Amino acid sequence: MTGSSSQFQQLEKLGEGTYATVYKGRNRTNGQLVALKEINLDSEEGTPSTAIREISLMKELDHENIVTLYDVIHTENKLTLVFEFMDKDLKKYMEAHGNQGALDLKIVKSFIFQLLKGIMFCHDNRVLHRDLKPQNLLINNKGELKLGDFGLARAFGIPFNTFSNEVVTLWYRAPDVLLGSRAYTASIDIWSAGCIFAEMCTGKPLFPGTSNDDQLIKIFRLMGTPNERTWPGVSSYANFKNNWQIFVPQDLRLLIPNLDSMGLNLLSSLLQMRPDARITARQALQHPWFHEISNPNPLMQHLADPYQQSQQQSQQQAQQSQQMDPQTYR
C-alpha cells in the first residue's frame, strides 16, 4: 500500500467515532471519491487494536457487499484507511427515503438480501462482524448495500471461541449475548440482521432498550420469556434470572402488518431466541421470499434510489409526451 496523505483531499467531515474520524475525500490523481478514516495514534499506546483488526480482516474480505479498503497510509502520528465512498448509511437512507423511516418492501427485500450475502461471505471466511446496525450498513446511489466498520469484527477459528460479550450496539444484540454468553457463534450476526429487517419495515427499532436488563425485557415482551423447556440450558447463563415476568410470544403480524406471510416466516427464522435455532445466512438466501430475485446482481432496477427512479421516470414521460406532441412535428 503505497499512497500518501497528500494524494487525498478532504472534502467534508462525515462522522466521528470512538477512535476515528471519517471524511469524504477525493483522490487528487484520478478524481475518485473516497472515504478517509483517520485514526490519531497515541505516542504511548500506538495503533488501536480495533484498527489493526479492521485492517487485517478487510484486506481479506473482497466481496460486492463489503466496503472495499483501497489503501492504508501510515504516518508518524496518524493512520488513514482509504475506503470506497458510499453515499449514506442505512439509518440516513431510511430517514431520507422512508415513510417515517419505513421503506418500500421491494427496497427492504433487496437490502436484506444484500446484507445476508455480505454476512454469508464473512461467515464463510470465518469472520463475525459483531456490530451490525443501520449505521454500519452503507448504501450508494446505485442501491448497493455494503457492510462497513469492521472495528469489532473477529476471526473465529473454531465454532465456540470465547469472546467478550460487550459487542453489538445494544438494540441489535442477541439474547444469548445479553444473557452473558461468552461462547457464541455466527448466529449473533443473524439476530442483528433480523432486527434490521424489522426496522426497515416499520421505520422504528424493534428492541430499543436502555440497558442490558431493559433490552432483555423488550425482547421477552415480543418473543416470550425463555425457560428450560423452550431454550434448554438458558438458566446456566450468567445473567439469567428466575424472577423475570412471564411473557408469551406475540404475533409478529401485529407489529409488522405490511409484511407478507413469507417475509414474516423469514423474519421469524432470523429472530429465534435460541442461537442454534437461528437460520444461517446461506439458508436465509435460499428462502422462498427471495425467489423473485432471480438475478443476484445488486444492480437490479428496484435496488436503485427511489428518488432517482422517480426522477428518471418523470424525464422519460416528458420525453415521450414531447415525441407524441403533434406540435413537435410542425
Curated annotation (Swiss-Prot):
Residue sites binding ATP per the record: L14, G15, E16, G17, T18, Y19, A20, T21, V22, K37
Keyword presence, Kinase: yes
Residues covered by region (Disordered): 300-330
Record-listed E.C. numbers: 2.7.11.22
Alphabetized InterPro entries for the sequence: CDK, Kinase-like_dom_sf, Prot_kinase_dom, Protein_kinase_ATP_BS, Ser/Thr_kinase_AS
Active site residues according to the UniProt entry: D131 (proton acceptor)
Presence of the UniProt keyword Cell membrane in the record: no
Principal EC category: transferase
Gene Ontology cellular component terms for the protein in this record: cellular bud neck; cytoplasm; nucleus; Pho85-Pho80 CDK-cyclin complex
Catalysis: reaction(s): L-seryl-[protein] + ATP = O-phospho-L-seryl-[protein] + ADP + H(+); L-threonyl-[protein] + ATP = O-phospho-L-threonyl-[protein] + ADP + H(+)
Superkingdom, taxonomy of origin: Eukaryota
Keyword entries, A-Z: ATP-binding, Kinase, Nucleotide-binding, Serine/threonine-protein kinase, Transferase
GO molecular function terms listed in the Swiss-Prot or TrEMBL record: ATP binding; cyclin-dependent protein serine/threonine kinase activity; protein serine kinase activity
BP-aspect Gene Ontology terms: DNA damage response; filamentous growth; G1/S transition of mitotic cell cycle; lipid homeostasis; negative regulation of calcium-mediated signaling; negative regulation of glycogen biosynthetic process; negative regulation of macroautophagy; negative regulation of phosphate metabolic process
Compositional bias segments (type: Low complexity): 308-323
Protein kinase domain sequence ranges: 8-290
Gene3D superfamilies associated with the record: Phosphorylase Kinase, domain 1, Transferase(Phosphotransferase) domain 1
Family: Belongs to the protein kinase superfamily. CMGC Ser/Thr protein kinase family. CDC2/CDKX subfamily.
Summary of the function given for this chain in its UniProt record: When phosphate concentrations are high it phosphorylates the PHO4 transcription factor thus establishing repression.
Assembly mode: Interacts with a number of cyclins.
This protein's name: Negative regulator of the PHO system
